[in-house]
Amino acid sequence: MTFQNKKILVAGLGGTGISMIAYLRKNGAEVAAYDAELKPERVSQIGKMFDGLVFYTGRLKDALDNGFDILALSPGISERQPDIEAFKQNGGRVLGDIELLADIVNRRDDKVIAITGSNGKTTVTSLVGYLCIKCGLDTVIAGNIGTPVLEAEWQREGKKADVWVLELSSFQLENTESLRPTAATVLNISEDHLDRYDDLLDYAHTKAKIFRGDGVQVLNADDAFCRAMKRAGREVKWFSLEHEADFWLERETGRLKQGNEDLIVTQDIPLQGLHNAANVMAAVALCEAIGLSREALLEHVKTFQGLPHRVEKIGEKNGVVFIDDSKGTNVGATAAAIAGLQNPLFVILGGMGKGQDFTPLRDALVGKAKGVFLIGVDAPQIRRDLDGCGLNMTDCATLGEAVQTAYAQAEAGDIVLLSPACASFDMFKGYAHRSEVFIEAFKAL
């Protein structure tokens, strides 16, 4: 792919957008920058990084009318809007940073492990990266997990990697056509981002774009959407919490197995919850697909401590355990967190619902939750969706109030779980900030 003298508009000026500007300018493109809202201080900051960079703001259509060949989109901007559709119909090309990286790794023949799914993808990406590093591979961990892929490539100064471990969101996959992972997984599909997609099937089809090429597919046998993603003629590794598969959990003994062979007992896995047993199986399958030793992988699984804000115990007071799952930003994540915990629960839900249907939480909560505490802008919708199933629900003005009220009702042996099933931006700067407030409220008890 050549960009010499191509006129390219980079839309969205966060970390991904900045990395695309740097990469494209280095490769000879004539680059301009666009954001719907641009504050003078941001223009000044970016302008110091890139001499002579032209900025556009306001309507995207007005910017695109300036004769651009390519529109490079940051993940937060959907290409499903009339201005972009018209740009494509007039011969313009739309791509993102993953498509740019695909061109690089394809030319170098770097191995790629690609990971997506509604829930668990950050944990699995981190675990796969950790296992690859522990097994001695020169490993790059990038993508939706935090470091933009082109920033990671820039830092390596063009040096070939043994393996790229990429966390990819559905947004990043929308305009990715050339990535051919050595091994890839869709961990699961549940309602998320339905404010951006037509329906759940549309969302699942976007996720399935991760399986372009002929690499190994690692698929969740318990998920109907994932089962439908199997491609003819491809090597597939199935994992399951429900029945025998290539990788599966024997519930009676708590053993993870590969076929008939014992792999590891769940007690030896630091990650809590049944959903993390599935994450471990997916990670081991992905790593085996690039030739890593199963024996070494299982030893290193025992030392992986997981990530903050994902079903993480933050403390205990008078026998009541407090668990932070602030990263549980959709219904599927919260249902998985609840299913993976055995003790009686008081669950804090709420925030920005992103168009989700919360009724699937009814089955997850009934019989396990002694109380539900609702916060945030979509608390009324959650109450409506859960109404009538016998749950004791309490509306709280703040997260701190929810923590205090839950603790007042809890007994020794109970768990207070923050797993909101919602985004956080109505009340917090992000899920990490929401977690900080939760921890502060716990410490104040």
Curated annotation (Swiss-Prot):
It comes from the Bacteria. Its EC number is 6.3.2.9. GO terms for molecular function: ATP binding; UDP-N-acetylmuramoylalanine-D-glutamate ligase activity. ATP binds at G117, S118, N119, G120, K121, T122, T123. One of its GO terms (biological process) is cell wall organization. Pfam families: Mur_ligase_C, Mur_ligase_M, MurD-like_N. Keywords: ATP-binding, Cell cycle, Cell division, Cell shape, Cell wall biogenesis/degradation, Cytoplasm, Ligase, Nucleotide-binding, Peptidoglycan synthesis. It catalyses: UDP-N-acetyl-alpha-D-muramoyl-L-alanine + D-glutamate + ATP = UDP-N-acetyl-alpha-D-muramoyl-L-alanyl-D-glutamate + ADP + phosphate + H(+). GO terms for cellular component: cytoplasm. Pathway: Cell wall biogenesis; peptidoglycan biosynthesis. It is found in: Cytoplasm. Its main location: cytoplasm. Belongs to the MurCDEF family. NCBIfam families: murD. Cell wall formation. Catalyzes the addition of glutamate to the nucleotide precursor UDP-N-acetylmuramoyl-L-alanine (UMA). This is UDP-N-acetylmuramoylalanine--D-glutamate ligase.
